[in-house]
Amino acid sequence: MARREVDDSYTNGSVVEVVSIEEGSKMDKEDDHQNPQAPDGGDVVVCGMPMSFTFLQMLLAEFLATFFLMFAGLGAITVEEKKGAVTFPGVAVAWGAAVMAMVYAVGHVSGAHLNPAVTLGFAVAGRFPWRRAPAYALAQTAAATAASVVLRLMFGGRHAPVPATLPGGAHAQSLVIEFVITFYLMFVIMAVATDDQAVGHMAGVAVGGTIMLNVLFAGPVSGASMNPARSIGPALVGSKYTALWVYILGPFAGAAAGAWAYSLIRLTGDRTD
């Protein structure tokens, strides 16, 4: 019933995009045999827990890609605030371009989730094993925190502000906006990352363009987070937790709903009128 496909595109190039929950439960055992470079038949021990070498590679890819994304996006905001040289549309382009680059860079390795909400969406849709989701979310959040620390040290030291997401109006308004734009983002991701009838090689452009559009119209209202890691990282570094719940609840709910909605309307066979 489960199947694994190999392809260079973002859609099918990663285990996380094409592996069902049933096969996901077998992945660790398969990795043990497929990775003779890892010690003890494929398992390595991290914090007292055995993990397959392949999964550690996936986690490292997620960490690095999320770090570079946050460094570019948060860095653009920081430069704009300090120098006024980027402009608001430039910030939107920076986020979208960074996402696009990372999708093409590590999509075939880890799936380029870059976002705990996206990981949740894939899990809800049966496209990612639930038991691996917490490790992905932890790697993504750690990367966002690390990027925030580096930017803070680069632009003023430990007392420098970190670009946080804050509501531009009522908390309820920002919550709704975050839900809607993350729903929109996850809906697009599901289309290009899981549907064989979509143009997979354009996935980076589609996802990056969606991010850019969302930032352009939702940025002044909610900050256009769409990503709990993006909000949690700067909040931890800056010790500012105002309305943080908005940027956790909204994206998680939106991604889950977006993944479910696309699964509902997805064409699974030949279309008949």
Swiss-Prot record:
UniProt topology in membrane: Multi-pass membrane protein
Pfam families: MIP
Annotated disulfide bonds: none
Gene3D superfamilies xrefs: Glycerol uptake facilitator protein
TM annotation in the entry: 59-79, 86-106, 133-155, 174-194, 198-218, 245-265
Motif stretch (NPA 2): 227-229
GO molecular function, one term: channel activity
Positions occupied by motif NPA 1: 115-117
Main location: membrane
Protein location: Membrane
Keywords of this entry: Membrane, Repeat, Transmembrane, Transmembrane helix, Transport
UniProt tissue specificity: Expressed in leaves.
UniProt cross-references to SUPFAM superfamilies, sorted A to Z: Aquaporin-like
Cellular component annotations (GO), alphabetically ordered: membrane
Function: Aquaporins facilitate the transport of water and small neutral solutes across cell membranes.
Domain comment (free text): Aquaporins contain two tandem repeats each containing three membrane-spanning domains and a pore-forming loop with the signature motif Asn-Pro-Ala (NPA).
Entry similarity comment: Belongs to the MIP/aquaporin (TC 1.A.8) family. NIP (TC 1.A.8.12) subfamily.
Name of the protein described by the UniProt record: Aquaporin NIP1-4
Record gene name: NIP1-4
